[in-house]
Amino acid sequence: MALIVQKFGGTSVGTVERIEQVAEKVKKFRDGGDDIVVVVSAMSGETNRLIDLAKQISEQPVPRELDVMVSTGEQVTIALLAMALIKRGVPAVSYTGNQVRILTDSAHTKARILQIDAQRIQRDIKAGRVVVVAGFQGVDEKGNITTLGRGGSDTTGVALAAALKADECQIYTDVDGVYTTDPRVVAKAQRLDKITFEEMLEMASLGSKVLQIRAVEFAGKYSVPLRVLHSFQEGPGTLITLDEEESMEQPIISGIAFNRDEAKLTIRGVPDTPGVAFKILGPISAANVEVDMIVQNVAHDNTTDFTFTVHRNDYNNALQVLQGIAAEMGAREAIGDTNIAKVSIVGVGMRSHAGVASRMFEALAKENINIQMISTSEIKVSVVIEEKYLELAVRALHTAFELDAPAGNTAE
């Protein structure tokens, strides 16, 4: 008998029919002898519908009141799922984040979980009940309802698994696991049986949408075994593990991640003096713009060109700030480019194998793809390229690192 926390997202509970299917799946696990805690999101599209309603009142809704409003979406889903389970003869009870005391800070719309009081859930489990908990929400010390931001239900699931010391946290999605890359781009992408937390964290931060980065961070911090599974198909999914040895038989590179949400900014001809990076990035940070990759080139005339990347939706704001900085510092110009993308190779095998980066660069060179920026870590190499070459680059790297599935075994 195992204690399993199962999390189902909005698509998985998007209709009453799908909620009935989820109830069947939960019943199957319980009939097998497992204790089950279920975390669910609001039905697909419901959170957006509620936000749109709020914006009909105010373009910038008060965050506290917005949290009160959008948290109702999950309340509907938990009650429906509990009803579906009870109809099947499975004792079940539903709880909001407040009712199980998921304590968060007071950062409305983007709160972070501080503590969970697991006693109430443990009593229900002991009494033989399936506990259905609303994801995405909690309560602060003053009793105010809070929400965790987009993807917060994943974090709720992992946090509950940690608090309950569950044997596994299962994240159910519309894919049957973590793939070597997006199967929509590379038909020969393969599902990974196992991947390390480090690799998953890198892939999540680099644009992989399978798991939210906060959930992966939480799982790694509290050593919660994570498994990604398809909501309505049978299969082993992908186990995310702390043990690198379990991944030793995998290739050097576990996956190719990519992100189109990139923009590049450059300030040219800046006087090369101490503190130049802070003078540029300080105001950018103050404008709440997150900087990703950075490259600095020093010229012979004691000036420097400073280039960095940001999220594409921050581009206009960042360029406006950078133009002001250029005028203040006497730089030649501030320019930008939104026609870029980032491609990354990820794998713990890089630690013990030389020449991985050069192999990546060679594969791109063979396709005449120019590299504009490079960033590396122990288990990752990222490059910025022209966006129109993105899919070509991903396919070339997938083949170069021998990640293609054998003939007749491609992703569907």
UniProtKB/Swiss-Prot annotation:
The entry lists its GO molecular-function terms as: aspartate kinase activity; ATP binding
What is the uppermost EC class here?
transferase
Keyword list, A-Z? Allosteric enzyme, Amino-acid biosynthesis, ATP-binding, Cytoplasm, Diaminopimelate biosynthesis, Kinase, Lysine biosynthesis, Methionine biosynthesis, Nucleotide-binding, Threonine biosynthesis, Transferase
Predominant location = cytoplasm
Does the keyword section mention Kinase? yes
GO BP annotations of the record are: diaminopimelate biosynthetic process; homoserine biosynthetic process; lysine biosynthetic process via diaminopimelate; methionine biosynthetic process; threonine biosynthetic process
Describe the family membership recorded for this protein in Swiss-Prot or TrEMBL.
Belongs to the aspartokinase family.
Q: What does this protein do?
A: Involved in the biosynthesis of L-aspartate-beta-semialdehyde which is a central intermediate in the biosynthesis of different amino acids (L-lysine, L-methionine, L-threonine). Catalyzes the phosphorylation of the beta-carboxyl group of L-aspartate to yield 4-phospho-L-aspartate.
* Annotated protein name in UniProt: Aspartate kinase Ask_LysC
- Per the UniProt entry, what species is this protein from, by scientific name? Stutzerimonas stutzeri (strain A1501)
Q: What is the lineage of its organism?
A: Bacteria, Pseudomonadati, Pseudomonadota, Gammaproteobacteria, Pseudomonadales
